[in-house]
A protein has these predicted regions:
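Cysteine-centric segments in proteins
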Residues: 1-103
Length: 103
């Protein structure tokens, strides 16, 4: 179990014949000497709405504290997301959840 605080984040939703899943697509800037990083959470189980942030709890036990002013994608995660769109199984959909709620 790990706790993450990403530099940028979005919620992605997948719909397949097996059901609907929402996950955090998170990224961190590497800075001058580091590499940018990204991570896709295991699947949101519940959300805490705290002042200025959401804390997303996931199937793996990990949490992502996502600051409201940091919602969005880096170029790195934008490219990753669009590469997934190209290889979706037939009948499956993948989308970015623009305004998050726990529906």
């Amino acid at each position: 179990m790990s706790d993450y605080v990403p530099d940028k984040w979005v919620i992605v939703e997948t719909v397949t014949s097996e059901g609907t899943t929402r996950k955090v697509l998170a990224s961190w800037y590497g800075g001058y000497q580091g590499a940018d990083e990204w991570r896709l959470s295991s699947g949101i189980t519940y959300t805490e709405d705290v002042e200025g942030a959401y804390i997303f709890h996931n199937e793996s036990g990990s949490t992502y504290e996502c600051i409201l002013g940091r919602q969005g994608m880096s170029i790195y995660t934008y490219d990753r997301y669009h590469s997934w769109l190209k290889v979706l199984p037939e009948g499956a959909t993948l989308r970015i959840v623009e305004e998050y709620n726990e529906d």
